[in-house]
From Swiss-Prot:
GO biological process: leucyl-tRNA aminoacylation
Organism: Buchnera aphidicola subsp. Acyrthosiphon pisum (strain APS)
Pfam families registered for this protein in UniProt: Anticodon_1, tRNA-synt_1, tRNA-synt_1_2, tRNA-synt_1g
CDD domains in alphabetical order: Anticodon_Ia_Leu_BEm, LeuRS_core
EC number in record: 6.1.1.4
Disulfide bonds: none
Binding sites annotated in the UniProt record for ATP: K621
Name by which UniProt lists this protein: Leucine--tRNA ligase
Motif ('KMSKS' region): 618-622
Amino acid sequence: MEKEYSPKKIENYVQEFWKKNKTFEVKEDPKKEKYYCLPMLPYPSGKLHMGHVRNYTISDVISRYQRMLGKNVLQPMGWDAFGLPAEEAAIRNNTDPFSWTQKNIKYMKKQLQSLGFSYDWSREITTCHPEYYHWEQWFFTKLYEKKLVYKKNSLVNWCSYDKTVLANEQVIDGCCWRCQNKIRIKQIPQWFIKIRNYAESLYQDLKKLTHWPENVKNMQRNWIGRIKGFEITLNVFNTCQKLKVFTQRLDLLMGVTYISISSCHKLSINLSKKNELIKKFIKKYRYISQEEQYKVKYTGINTNLFVVHPITKKTIPIWISNATHIEYGTNAVLSIPGHNENDWNFAVKNNLKIKYVIFNPDHQEPKLYTSFLDIKGTLFNSQEFNGLNLKDGTEKIKKILYKKKILKEKINYKLQDWCISRQRYWGTPIPMAKFKNGKMIPIPENQLPVVLPKIRKNTNLLQQAINFNSKWAEIFIHGKHAIREIDTFDTFMESSWYYARYTCPNFNTGMIDSIASKYWLPVDQYIGGIEHAIMHLMYFRFYHKLLRDFKLVDFDEPVKNLLCQGMVLSEAFYKIDSNSQRKWFNSSSVLIKRNTKGEIIESHTQKGEKLIYAGMIKMSKSKNNGIEPELIIQRYGADTIRLFIMFSAPVESDLEWKESGLKGIYRFLKKLWMLIFNYIDIKNTHKKINFDFLNHQQSELRYQLHKTIAKVSDDIGRRQTFNTAISEIMKLVNQLSKAPIKEEQDKSIMRESLICIIKMLYPFTPHFCFFVWNYFNNHSSIDNEKWPIFQKDILSKKYSTIVAQINGKKRCATKISDSLTKEEIFLYIQNQPIIKKYLEDVDIKKIIYIPKKIINFVT
């Protein structure tokens, strides 16, 4: 063992060993308990960033820990390889997306391997490879056969910059989630999967996810938007038409003063064909996103039609409103301005009647702006329902409407069907075709996969690609000429089932091998960012339910435990250029002046230009504040990065990247290295500890060791507070570095402690621990070692803190085992260096001892 810690030499050696011995490749083993740990697969953008490194380090720590518990651990890795960024990057670099993507994968794989992640690379998948998306296409045709997919002209979110459709979940504040450009609403033919058919199970099964973060589940509940209420069928006055309206509050029925329908309602469309004002209104407000509906000022137009109130028989006007959201299911709602703020604003603006029908509990005044969840109050101004509380009023109205056969209870959802077609080249071709008569037909199974046409130059639209390879678009199905569908799948399709394919990546006779999937699924631990809470994780759960219903997987949910790590933040600097745009500078090229607290007070470029400090913000290419993992590895080693990432912040919190913290971790590893180098004589420290003859210091050290094992085991295994686990290990190392090595017992305890420390650090710093382990055990690799087990009997021993005084003045406080005799306690404390100094050459006249509290030497 060399005296100096040299991470580069060690890490290269260890990584080569793992690669040569295929250490982390696994197979199904019914005799062993399985553990499937899955980090979200990366998009091969070109280089890993520290956000990736954090995600994958967390996953690797969990995987290595579970492996040490004796489990058969699967931790795979692959590439979410289709998508818009690769297509645009290929255009910029005058190449094709496939070549660009493969080049990036090669580089990023090398980066991952340099960080020592324990992946089973034999299961690597790349979603742009036909052998992967073949089965995605096959499954789509099965969904089509079961009428779970359909194509229709649809209002869609259109990004003019990217020239493609966005799902509702991909629109943030009215802008494209990727390029941040404003979206517009457009009507084009689109493919959809009926996720609304699964809305109830997606909502209810959230209760089964007991080990998912509550905020993620709440975000999904809100997006599904389950609304329980009633659908009432009303007669349109002086016509044969019926109008179905939705309400959550039957008790307020007597307060309805107008009906509000959306511009998308069938009645609105029909009226627009004859009424130019309605036509203009619909044109203005129909083509806005759901998100924008919440922001526009409420306005409307009178249809001059009426419905008949089902109880009073009075007529109620029908208005088309831009505030009636399609999320309510019927596009038509009862409006009760006396008890709803939005309805009140609309009524005041349009001079509509306002009627109050609920008194406050004290019966003194009408109750305004009643919440849908508010069930306190008394009905008035409601004819035969006057004086009833709201619950009784609801029941009485319900009976009347049921008797008329115009009422049914209904649950509506905000969740809309999943739009899965995209107008781009670099994606999975949708396996459908159209005959000359317009009939759609799925591509037959024996003609799958439908492989993308090869292109000779970069392009951004599939239609242009087809122009280069016109034969690709033409196909014969059952002897008839047909034209292929030219849209491609939303890339969320690929990332919705990859977890299942990892269990059988080389299975070529079907989508999923039932034997492998039954063994490995569900995923035991999934790790990814909170930004995926709605889009990816919703589709992920939905797709699993589809696979389940086709008997391809078991279980109702794909993942048991979900961990959402925080972002990685870094210092960012910019200046305003001549075009009033921000130009960002990487901190490595910035001259920084700090105050005594370490706070930045000035920053300049190398040329002396003054910069503005933007604070600690998320690492990103756009802000030029990313840190290259390779540079840190070269300087400090992969283990230092790994340990720093896991130590610097709780995994759910944002992590502030500071090189000073890296240096501190590096010093710790060097300190531990020297402790092993200096204090362990490998040949002479194999003697067993004689537990019958341990002095107090030895007993205390063993107590701290097993206390640390217990705490670290709980922190990693149950609490997932990895930073506190590392902190406990560091404390123990500090104690060991101060422990005297005077006799064989000391050496044996030191050996026991170091062995346990190495095992506990192994998930965090696997290269370091692999290497030093060889000096403790030449017979097996640490990769095959078991996690240390704490001894309960040691921790159950009781200790008391005894204050030592000389002539009544406190000199020290010492923790002492309650099992020691009074004489042993006296002797031990007298030999403490600080006490020994004061008692040297002094006669002790008396010892005053209060058990478990105070010992006072009187001289």
